[in-house]
Amino acid sequence: MTAKGAFDRFLAFARRWTKRIDDAPEALHAWLGRERAAWKEKGWRGVVTPPRVTGAILTLLLVGSASFWWVTRPPALPDYAAVRAGWHPSEAWLYDRHGVLIDSSRIDYQARRLAWTKLQDVSPVARDIVIAAEDRRFREHGGVDWMALTGAARDRLEGKRGRGASTLSMQVAAYLAPDLANPGSRGVRDKLRQMRAAWALESRWSKDQILEAYLNLAGFRGEAQGIGAAALGLFGKTPATLTRDDALLLAALLPNPQAAPGEVARRACALSRDKDCSRFAGDAASMLGPARSLALDPGLAPHLSAALLTRPGARITTTLDASIQRAAITALKRQLQGLGGSRARDGAVIVVDNQSGDVLAYVGGIGGESTAPAVDGAASYRQAGSTLKPFLYAMGIEKGYLTAASILDDSPVQLDTASGLYVPQNYDKAFKGPVSARIALAGSLNVPAVRTLLLTGVDAFRDRLWDTGYRGLVEDGQYYGYSLALGSAEVTLMEQVDAYRSLALEGRWSPLRLTMDAKTEAPRRTTTPQAAWIVADMLADPNARAGTFGVDSALRLPFWAAVKTGTSKAMRDNWCVGFTDRFTVGVWVGNLEGDPMRAVSGTSGAAPVWRDVMLALNEANPGRAPPRPEGIEERQIRFAAGIEQPRREYFLKGTGLDRIAYAPPEARRPRIVNPVGGSVYALDPDIPRDNQRLAISVSGQALGHRLILDKRDLGTADSRPLILAPPGKHRLALVDLDGKTVDQVLFTIR
């Protein structure tokens, strides 16, 4: 059949049915007349319905029923298991190692939801009151309360204020299918869709499942969704501990979650049917007062929660101890308040268990007067100050360059560097002359530290720091220069604490743990047990630090503890990091925006916090000195020319001396002083090239050593030759009698 033929047949069909429709009123009228006459004559026996009319009526009924069924069809609803599985709290929670809630973080901002509350975790009185208030025949009907529906219809016809007829099942269906509860969805069709959805829900869910879902999905106040969030936010309770009055007030919120306290009190009174309802007015005002917050977590570790809590509903158990966390917060807050006039606004505290590496306290800041309260002070990179010196001296002792009794000259020194002349000074701008390494480290003297760095080498020391967990040192040693000994590099408090912990563990380093499920990595050795032990003993010596800090500073504790302070340039940062046999504690005080403090050093800023935390940690079991490892000998020593008082000192076996007069030979090993590594020298175009020379200078005992320039032997190092090198990059090496390179520099001539 052609397309035209099909179209013609369709038109003929349409005309026939159009005529039948047009004739229908007259035919129907005639039929009704005949039926009426038959009824008058014979009653029901005389009524005869023509088959065609009967078919039409049945057709109309079927079409109408199908249309009704279609337009009132409910949306597809998930089953109970799917709703439970798809439930995501708006929060994530942080717990300490003992299961105590220490913080939470808001992840989802659409609503405030807690974890799904099981029906058995809601107090029985609260369950009964919610049913009585919202659907008192809930246990009896099959999804639609016909009595309530009839009453609501009668009230509407009589012009009365309509009562609610939506059952719990209908409300749950509306929560699961939001289009059932759209604004304006109050027509007959919408109500019928809700009814059919409720029937479908009742056919697949149990009554307890429907009630449980309602208690979790219902909105109570503001953005609080579910009885868990409402109980915690409005009463500070769990659903299991809700009393009768609590439940009455919560049920009074359900019809209008934003109702004023007076309206809530009146509705609670009506639900209670008590004669004396005066208590509800005050309870409602207190419950809904502006001071009530929906976030009642302790808020003990906001910076750590911001870092760890990224997934809604997450429950992370940290290594923290809530009691130690509180003690650290209290100590830091008290100190910052005391420094109010010194422009010190920020601080951070880390406490670590030495053996496990578990972080027991993590305080990234306390807010207060901070201008950057969201910034984590424990993870921020700041200048280290003098806190890197212990690792420098440990390296010197380990390599045999010096001992704890070696004499270092604390006197003015000028060092040529690629960026100019470097002149280190002490904190108090004074110099003490010859001092032992013990006094120099414990007293945090700067010039002796720089002289020690000359022994170890900048690159080697930078590499040692990197191995000890200081991951912010991404440049080579030449970038930091001699100031690396004095803490020009930037470090974090977490890195500091972990590095000092390695000294407490005899030179073994491993990453710290923040969560209980984190893997424990095997430690690696960064220095020898002997060097670590000797440095720890130097840091724990109150007599050695007395010349700089006094005999009764904040660093002195009634038990054994090794400690070091540090202050960065212009007093922008100060540190105090130390350890006992069981704990390592680190404190940073400063300003996260980088502006300087006013006359605040490590001993006056960070040290009091460190002391308070250490006293709290060691109250029951005071810190004890670690046992001396093998390979260390103790000797009675005396110093020449009365440099220091006689004392007993510790040495690596084979390095001990009875009388200390000069630094050991290793401390005077030769170094290339000029040219300076990394320097760029330019030829003067106005001076004949043959007349331009570059002087070489070597310090220390260089007898028998030779200089090698780009594999060319320049002769013995004591000749101080002048060289003319062509433009380009050059390598100058100093080698000993065995041909071993003891020092080298790279420089450029243009």
Model features per residue range: what roles?
Residues 86-87, 118-168, 225-235, 242-247:
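Flexible, acidic/glycine-enriched loop-and-adjacent beta/alpha segments
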Residues 198, 202, 254-271, 312-324, ...:
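Active-site loop and adjoining helix of the penicillin-binding protein/serine DD-peptidase-beta-lactamase fold
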Residues 91-103, 122, 342-371, 463-468:
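A short, well-structured edge-of-sheet supersecondary motif
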Residues 64-68, 161, 165-326, 330, ...:
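Non-catalytic, structured segments within soluble enzyme domains
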Residues 318-341, 349-353, 362-365, 369-383, ...:
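A penicillin-recognizing enzyme superfamily signal
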Residues 2-95, 280:
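N-terminal type II signal-anchor transmembrane helix
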